[in-house]
């Protein structure tokens, strides 16, 4: 602690001191609210809103005191002072770090009621449907006692149910469903088809999971493309014939003949690349398969597409492991979330990797897809007028919360002193020695009848531990992505005496492990179990490896020691664990190996520092990745907001005919200037071409050549006005018979064209994003280039929307109002019946929704001179092809 901190206290201590003033005021008001009858508390909302509309400082104590009293009367739970501190932190738009078991669900009722009094919609965000429904039902009596309505948003609701839920005062919802509803609303063809409420105030539960772990996760609504899956099937045949190369050759130490291979794996950066020999070998196999013509080159521009299939198949084969990165359930490949250990239904990897894994596992290959609408959690949650959050582990990410979201972290003291004992890590030379020591520890603790939670980082590790326990005849239960349906039951029993539970990181975010197990009807029996566990030292956490993030390790520890209960945690590590193997230097590894003795563990401060520094480096790298994603997505987000704002205006306006008239005038002036430039002379005018263009594209006959022949005083400006006026008259005449309903037609045309162009624009932005990094070779800043080109593309898209809309409106043949209604109905049905899958993707991921059909493949032929791997790249970067577009 610094000298100044000793005098003034830390920033967190100073913030808590200010909040304590409010807590004291709330406690003074407690007797006053205890004296109120139920009817008075029910009607209090309007009274508080009237008396303290512009006085938040005085509103907080009254709103919080009322909520505390309502909770006591309905649930029997009284908010502790520490929970009041958490509520004040949330009300101020901060993140409240509150340890496991401190009652975050109850805390959320305080700022929720406060904001409802202020007239704000309150959204409480959870990580899954179960928690949203559980928390809503648990807290519903409190809210309804205070006159508030409560809604729950989940994935299985129909339109009417969801619409009703969003109309409530307090809404519980998952982060994914909120994001998808936002995207769906901005694809609606009628204003009444929107469901989502205004985004006023959000309380994000497990905020670190949603805003940090999921920050790189784009929310994508997508539809299928026509890419063939047969390429994966054919290229899969090549992979077993390739040999791995274990090191790069150097001048000092060139590769021996038997060391030369076809591909190299970089585990640290999770990449796999073909070597020069590998490219030659793959070309030969592709020719044998008929996918590449003889004498053609895999490096030519026309063959970039097939390289994508090769790269995806290599990654699927060597970087993604079954039961670690994904599971196969039935006929489907399900990704496993590295942070929680849960399967991620509906999520698919992009760049063809998911299809390649499906091919590898011999399950039906689903089609790739095209993005129809997308956003990121980072940008979606920044749409809320005020954002706050709760978690047990936020302090290690405080800098990121502040920089990205403008959220400060308030560390709330526990209601009872922490009694958990956190032991030093035990580090072994080998995984075998580590697991041997782990099993011995479990046997020892089981004799004491202590409940044991063994935390693993993957399904594979959990199954290894399970097999070892079976050999020792130690009864246990397993909670991983394969058994996630039993999660509630397993967690409920995890605190019983002598129970051994093996769990991946999914172990109970949002669910407490109660010492002695869940309380039963037999209070005496539960009391005996509870005391037995207390005597054994509480819940014992045994970690089998360190996670990349210190925060995830802290979450595992946080399962124990709730509300002042005793607890114990210890990590068993080995130098063969991924974190230590990839991020501990060779020199340090050699030192630790000299220190270690057989199956004994290593204890050394240098090792502890090395592990922590490795975690910090990874956390810093991941932060940089998330920050970079945001910088790019901010560009897309500005465009997204502009398009969605335009869509909202189109939906909400009763009549857009005036805007259409302006567009017609603007479009006609642009066309006129293309053929009759301003400041030009008559000899430069292309009048015949102008007449032909107007007739062919807009069915407008102006006969401008005759007009000019008859009136020599016509200037380019007057010609443009003449064309504009003629077009306006023609448009009015065209729709005179359906004048009352013309706005319906105009809206439908504008919306559909806007959506089509926006979809294509998203694809172009994806392509730009993937290729813009190459600009660095030309000494240009990729981010600046991305911003510049994205802006130009956006302007081009807006102009194209206007042009196409006017063309269609002039060419569309509508004879009656019934035809307009039929057109609108067809559009709505197409929207409902469109085969789309919703996706919470991994970074830049896509999704398909149909099984790909086997099709015969034509060999890819080149239409450019053969390009060698060491030739200059076609993009003009000046780099060799293998270092540029040929880089796997």
PLM regions and their residue ranges:
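Generic detector of ordered secondary-structure context
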Residues: 59, 302, 349, 393, ...
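Active-site-adjacent structural elements in folded domains
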Residues: 108, 438, 858-860, 868
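Extended, charged helical/alpha-beta scaffold domains that provide interaction surfaces
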Residues: 326-334, 340-347, 563-564, 571, ...
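A short, cysteine/histidine-rich metal-binding "knuckle" motif
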Residues: 867-873, 877-888
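Conserved P-loop NTPase motor core
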Residues: 1-596, 645, 662, 666
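Alpha-helix capping and helix-coil boundary motifs
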Residues: 50-59, 157-158, 293-297, 521-525, ...
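Generic detector of short, well-ordered, non-transmembrane alpha-helical segments enriched
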Residues: 3, 397, 498-499, 639, ...
């Amino acid at each position: 602690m610094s000298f100044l901190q000793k005098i003034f206290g830390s920033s967190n201590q100073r913030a808590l001191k200010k909040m304590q003033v409010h807590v004291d005021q709330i406690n003074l008001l407690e007797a006053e609210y205890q004296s109120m009858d139920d009817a008075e508390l029910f009607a209090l909302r309007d009274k508080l809103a009237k008396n303290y509309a512009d006085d938040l400082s005085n509103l907080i104590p009254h709103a919080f005191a009322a909520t505390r009293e309502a909770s006591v009367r309905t649930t029997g739970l009284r908010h502790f002072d520490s929970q009041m501190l958490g509520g004040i932190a949330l009300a101020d738009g901060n993140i409240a770090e509150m340890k496991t078991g401190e009652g975050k669900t109850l805390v959320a009722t305080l700022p929720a009621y406060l904001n409802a009094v202020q007239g704000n919609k309150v959204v409480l965000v959870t990580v899954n449907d179960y928690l949203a429904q559980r928390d809503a039902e648990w807290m519903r009596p409190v809210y309804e006692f205070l006159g508030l309505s409560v809604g729950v948003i989940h994935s299985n609701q129909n339109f009417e149910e969801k619409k009703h839920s969003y109309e409530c005062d307090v809404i519980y919802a998952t982060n994914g469903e909120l994001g998808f509803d936002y995207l769906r609303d901005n694809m609606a063809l009628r204003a009444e088809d929107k469901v989502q409420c205004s985004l006023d105030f959000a309380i994000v539960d497990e905020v670190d999971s949603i805003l940090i772990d999921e920050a790189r996760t784009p929310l994508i609504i997508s539809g299928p493309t026509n890419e063939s899956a047969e390429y994966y099937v054919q290229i899969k045949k090549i992979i077993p014939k390739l040999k791995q190369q274990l090191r790069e050759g150097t001048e000092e130490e060139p590769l021996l003949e038997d060391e030369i291979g076809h591909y190299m794996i970089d585990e640290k950066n999770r990449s796999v690349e073909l070597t020069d020999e590998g490219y030659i070998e793959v070309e030969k196999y592709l020719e044998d398969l008929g996918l590449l013509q003889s004498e053609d080159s895999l490096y030519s521009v026309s063959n970039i597409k097939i390289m994508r299939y090769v790269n995806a198949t290599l990654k699927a084969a060597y970087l993604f492991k079954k039961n670690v990165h994904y599971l196969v359930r039935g006929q489907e490949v399900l990704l496993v979330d590295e942070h929680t250990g849960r399967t991620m239904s509906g999520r698919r990897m992009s760049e063809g990797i998911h299809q390649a894994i499906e091919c590898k596992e011999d399950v039906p290959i689903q089609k790739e897809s095209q993005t129809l609408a997308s956003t990121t959690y980072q940008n979606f949650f920044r749409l809320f007028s005020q954002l706050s959050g709760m978690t047990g582990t936020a302090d290690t990410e405080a800098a990121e919360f502040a920089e990205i979201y403008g959220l400060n972290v308030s560390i709330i003291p526990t209601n009872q002193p922490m009694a958990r004992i956190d032991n030093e890590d035990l580090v072994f030379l080998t995984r075998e020695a580590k697991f041997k020591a782990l099993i011995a520890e479990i046997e020892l603790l089981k004799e004491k009848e202590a409940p044991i939670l063994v935390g693993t980082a993957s399904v594979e590790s959990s199954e290894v531990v399970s097999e070892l326990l079976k050999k020792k005849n130690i009864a246990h239960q397993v909670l991983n992505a394969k058994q996630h349906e039993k999660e509630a039951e397993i967690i409920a029993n995890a605190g019983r005496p002598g129970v051994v539970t093996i769990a991946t990181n999914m172990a109970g975010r949002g669910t407490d492990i109660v010492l002695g197990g869940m309380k039963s009807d037999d209070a005496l029996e539960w009391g005996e179990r509870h005391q037995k566990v207390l005597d054994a030292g509480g819940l014992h956490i045994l970690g089998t490896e360190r996670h990349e993030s210190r925060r995830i390790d802290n979450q595992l520890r946080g399962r124990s020691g709730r509300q002042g209960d005793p607890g114990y945690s210890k990590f068993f590590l080995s130098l063969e664990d991924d974190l230590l193997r990839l991020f501990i230097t060779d020199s340090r590894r050699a030192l630790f190996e000299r220190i270690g003795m057989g199956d004994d563990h290593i204890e050394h401060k240098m090792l502890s520092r090395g592990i922590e520094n490795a975690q910090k480096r990874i956390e810093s790298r991941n932060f940089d990745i998330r920050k970079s994603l945001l910088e790019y997505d901010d560009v897309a987000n500005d465009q997204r907001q502009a398009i969605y704002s335009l869509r909202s205006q189109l939906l909400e306006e009763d009549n857009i005919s005036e805007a259409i008239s302006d567009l017609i005038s603007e479009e006609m002036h642009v066309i006129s200037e293309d053929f009759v430039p301003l400041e030009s002379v008559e000899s430069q005018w292309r009048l015949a071409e102008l007449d032909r263009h107007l007739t062919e594209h807009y069915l407008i006959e102006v006969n401008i050549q005759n007009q000019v022949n008859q009136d020599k005083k016509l200037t380019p400006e007057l010609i443009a006005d003449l064309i504009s006026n003629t077009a306006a008259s023609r448009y009015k005449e065209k729709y005179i018979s359906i004048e009352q309903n013309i706005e319906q037609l105009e809206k439908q045309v504008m919306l559909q064209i806007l959506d089509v162009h926006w979809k294509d624009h998203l694809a172009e932005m994806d392509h730009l994003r993937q290729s813009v990094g190459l600009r660095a070779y030309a000494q240009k800043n990729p981010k600046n280039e991305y911003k510049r080109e994205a802006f130009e593309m956006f302007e081009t898209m807006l102009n194209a929307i206007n042009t196409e809309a006017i063309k269609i409106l002039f060419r569309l043949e509508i004879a009656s109002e019934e035809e307009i209604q039929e057109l609108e109905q067809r559009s709505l049905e197409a929207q409902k019946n469109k085969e789309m899958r919703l996706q919470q993707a991994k970074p830049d991921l896509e999704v398909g929704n149909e099984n790909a059909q086997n099709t015969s493949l034509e060999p890819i032929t080149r239409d450019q001179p053969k390009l060698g791997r060491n030739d200059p790249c076609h993009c003009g970067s000046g780099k060799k092809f293998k270092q540029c577009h040929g880089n796997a």
